[in-house]
Amino acid sequence: MKFSKSLLVLIPIIILIFSVNTQSQDQDIEEVIVYGKAIKESQQAAIEAKRSAPNLAEVISADAIGRFPDVNLSDSLGRLPGISIERDQGQARYVSFRGTPKRYTTTAFNGINIPGVENGRIPRFDSYPTVITSQVVANKAITSDMPGESISGFINIKTFKPSDVDGWSFATEVGRGEQDQGGGDITKENIRTSYSNDDFGFVVYGSSSTVEQITDNREPTYGGTKGAQTPDRIDFRSYKVERESEAFGGTFEKYLQNGGRIFLTSLNTEFTDNEERNDFRVYVSDGTPTTGSGYTGSARRLFNDATYINKTEMLTLGVETPIGEWDVEAQVSKIDTTFDTYMPIGYFIGGGQLTNLSYDISDPQNPIVNFDGTYRDVDYPVKLLVDAIGGLYTETDQFKFDISRENSRGQLKFGFQYDDRVATGGGATLATISVSGGYPADVCNPKDYRLGDFATPRNNDVGAFYTDNPALNECLNTVRPPRSDFPDDEKINIEETLMAAYIMQTFDMEWGNIIAGLRIEDTEYQTVGFRLATVSGDIGYENIAAGAKEELSVKRTYTNYLPSVHLNYDLAEDKKLRLSYSTGISRPSYIESRAAASINSISESIAGGNPFLKE
């Protein structure tokens, strides 16, 4: 199903609504009432939305978000009870409910499901700025009108509507800060303006934020046995990070005389992580636990100027209107996501260069290592240039239809959703390709780009230092081949079709209500790639890396029936008891089920997908 075909489905619905709408008679306006909306009222509306929700949910308003210096929605959601956030270098990225795996959480904008950018399933929230949100509903109990993959939680991000404020409105925010370590800048700017009258309305917004920081890592890797662990490797790493987040979009609405609306919404977000890494590694053989001295060790060095891009683009055409006694919602969406990594790595390998080596790792966060000289004196006989690349690019056409009405028992609601997804890319999670000719040290000598020692309060007796990686990268671009492409056996080629239908009935009682429903999801999944042909003898890294490949195509179809029941009992005017039973489905991610494998020449490891995984 392509976007144009989805549009053809929606156009007759819009024409029907216009034909019904034109039958309404114009009415004279006899009175104009102007309403103001205070911050307290906005927060009270969020509280009331939580109380009246048919399921267990947490609701946070835009005004509540604005009281805190949150850069993205992960920080904001982390303030809600029962929700935890996972961080990367101190910054919030993933969201999970009640300690469950983050893959059990799904996300949507205005009810439109967004595929996980990194792997098609798991959503990231660090690219979603707070300015776009009018209200965030974190559903902790899942009803049948929510995606089946929402096992532990479903987060619906509601963006601003033009009709939220009559006439013109304008909002802006500017923030500045500074990191304690390294003095990195923190900036935040956003702007939003809207206009609406009785006939039409529009809202447009833009947002940008940056975070600069230095991340100081010490990472010992252990061997040996429990209680007698010895260090195999000790890493001294420093990252100079600049993260940028940009978003822009808007909504145009045409209001119908029957109270409905036709709307076009655009949402575009982009998160860019620019990361300089300087990584010095000490290797020890046959060491002793905790402390040791008198060893001869080996050194390796990695340095790079990497770029990670995380992008979501969504365009939705929809209609909401009453038709007779029914409330009808229909939406067709085009959703594109991009996850791209480019990391050209200078990888220098030595052996036995570190003499009179001693170490003390009693504090793993601050290991102490000494040897004759410092890292500025170390030379490396092997100098490689490695392209670490990864990417997942998805295109989704989605059609969603929901209809509901009141009946003698309460409310009846049912709907249908169709998703057609294509995922391409490669190098999951990273492909490493050694650039022909190795590292051109005669032209781009790293010694010519040395800077000062690590800015760190920790021990740095080894003399780990910074390199001007961006300038060094510019030099490399003048002499090296262009960015490597994904190897054929690491390319991702996936097509997936999801069809879902649901029905749910709310039974109103004197003491509360019961909501019972059934959701049926049908999945068709196909992946094309390569697998390793049979290799005789030792199946080691070298054999696999050089082994013959053969084409593999796998197609699977399965159907899941997902019932749910929710009970809401009013114990008192300000107390409610909620009991829920729901079922869900955890599909393998595109990375886990791809017909491809990635070979890492740095760690000498292989990671591959399994297209025969079951849901």
Please place each PLM-identified region on the residue numbering.
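Extracytoplasmic beta-strand/coil segments of soluble accessory domains associated
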Residues: 74-113, 140
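N-terminal periplasmic accessory domains that precede
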Residues: 73-76, 93-96, 108, 123-125, ...
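Transmembrane beta-barrel strands of outer-membrane/channel proteins
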Residues: 36, 170-176, 204-210, 264-270, ...
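Structural signature of Gram-negative outer-membrane beta-barrels, strongest in the C-terminal barrel
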Residues: 253-257, 314-316, 333-335, 392-398, ...
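A beta-strand signature from Gram-negative outer-membrane beta-barrel systems
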Residues: 80, 114, 127-173, 215
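Short acidic/polar hinge/loop motifs at secondary-structure boundaries
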Residues: 85, 96, 112-140, 191
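Transmembrane beta-barrel wall of Gram-negative outer-membrane proteins
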Residues: 181-282, 300, 304-324, 563-566, ...
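N-terminal periplasmic "start-of-domain" segments of outer-membrane beta-barrel proteins
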Residues: 33-66, 94, 102, 112
